[in-house]
Regions:
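Glycine-rich FAD pyrophosphate-binding loop
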Residues: 53-77
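N-terminal Rossmann-like FAD-binding beta1-loop-alpha1 element of flavoenzymes
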Residues: 34-61
Length: 400
């Protein structure tokens, strides 16, 4: 079986518009005759079910949690990118497309990335309409900040709780459609198998997690929005419920993995504290906006960070990548941090960590401004490690 993405061909700027125009449309009065199954109720699944229901389709949404609000999307922190160019710093749909492809080490499927950049502008408007409280500037306009892999400010955020606020917005839209009768919600239900007819997914087999009842659900289309498979790695920030079983069952029915190693690696996780610890805590990528990453220049230097003078510190990302500084793409920052630790310059008891220092940003902007941006993240870090990041540098290490 060959891998066929069914991505449109031709000049990339016109490919999707041409593809959409050539698709067969469904009359609004006929949409209620179609049944769509959505497996998963996080940001992707919940938003898809709500949007499809609002368009007029009959939707059945399934999740194994007690409520869609229990989805792991709540763990996303830093923000969501969109090419709105509010800061007038040269951003555009093509620049977002280019930065995303480059940040993916040129392994991404370019047609899909371009479509993502195209719809990013509308996604922000949809989120605002759903009531997502994005941060705003003093004049009331939506604020932006920078993220890794970009030289423009295009990230819309809600402090360090962007995923939670986006999920609440999608959940409210989903509940509205449930109330209107276009979406039927099936909680505490696990997908056991995918039903494939002539190469197309036409339904699922489910098990009720309360009474064990097994049922078959048939539809005209199936949307799998069940999250990633990061828990196949030992060190992971994913919840234990992110078990990748739906992906595996789709694979057994003939779905192909285009690039199984293409998982998201975060360079800003709290390092392991014990030999048998596998569940890690993610700190937001947005921290790299104001935090400076460094290690001691001398391998094996175990002095407290405050005792290491400035000329004995190596701000290795700023040294190697002056154009991006600490905002290099995640895989580059992760590889660089691991290389420093492997060379013996890692910090902390285990040596698996680098410093993320906010002392300069606090001097420049003031403690109150830093607290406004990252206060909840600093509180979470102190609760887990017992260290105050306003006074001592954070310690971070890459993880899935």
């Amino acid at each position: 079986m060959g891998l066929n993405s069914h991505a449109p061909t031709g000049p990339i700027e016109q490919a999707w518009d041409k593809h959409k125009f050539e698709l067969k449309l469904i009359n609004p009065a006929n949409k209620r005759k179609y049944n769509i199954i959505v497996v998963g109720s996080g940001l992707a699944g919940g938003a898809a079910a709500a949007s499809l229901g609002e368009l007029g389709y009959n939707v059945q949404c399934f999740c194994y949690q007690d409520s869609p609000r229990r989805a792991h999307s709540i763990a996303a922190q830093g923000g969501i990118n969109a090419a709105k160019n509010y800061h007038n710093d040269g951003d555009s749909i093509f620049r977002l497309f280019y930065d995303t492809v480059k940040g993916g080490d040129f392994r991404s499927r370019e047609a899909n990335v371009y479509r993502l950049a195209q719809v990013s502008v509308n996604i922000i408007d949809q989120c605002v309409a759903q009531g997502v409280p994005f941060a705003r500037e003093y004049g009331g306009l939506l604020d932006n900040r920078s993220f890794g892999g970009a030289q423009v400010s295009r990230t819309f955020y809600a402090r360090g709780q962007t995923g939670q606020q986006l999920l609440l917005g999608a959940y409210q839209a989903l509940e509205r459609q449930i109330g209107l009768g276009t979406v039927t919600m099936n909680e505490r239900t696990e997908m056991l198998d995918l039903i494939v007819v002539d190469g197309q997914a036409r339904g699922i087999v489910t098990r009720d997690l309360c009474d064990g009842k097994i049922e078959v659900h048939i539809g005209d289309a199936v949307v799998l929005a069940t999250g990633g498979y990061g828990n196949v790695f030992y060190l992971s920030t994913n919840a234990k419920g992110c078990n990748a079983t739906a992906i595996w069952r789709a694979y057994k029915r003939g779905a192909l993995f285009a690039n199984p190693c293409f998982t998201q690696i975060h360079p800003t996780c709290i390092p392991v504290a014990g030999e048998y610890q596998s569940k890690l805590t993610l700190m937001s990528e947005s921290l790299r906006n104001d935090g400076r990453i460094w290690v001691p220049k001398t391998p094996g230097d175990k002095r407290p960070p405050a005792s290491i003078p400035e000329d004995e510190r190596d701000y290795y990302l700023e040294r190697r990548y002056p154009s991006f500084g600490n905002l290099v793409p995640r895989d580059i920052a992760s590889r660089a941090a691991k290389a420093e630790c492997d060379s013996g310059r890692g910090v902390g008891e285990t040596g698996l960590g680098v410093y993320l220092d906010f002392s300069e940003a606090i001097k420049r902007l003031g403690k109150q401004k830093i607290a406004e941006r990252y206060g909840n993240l600093f509180e979470m870090y102190e609760r887990i490690t017992g260290e105050n990041p306003y006074e001592v540098p954070m310690r971070i290490y890459p993880a899935i």
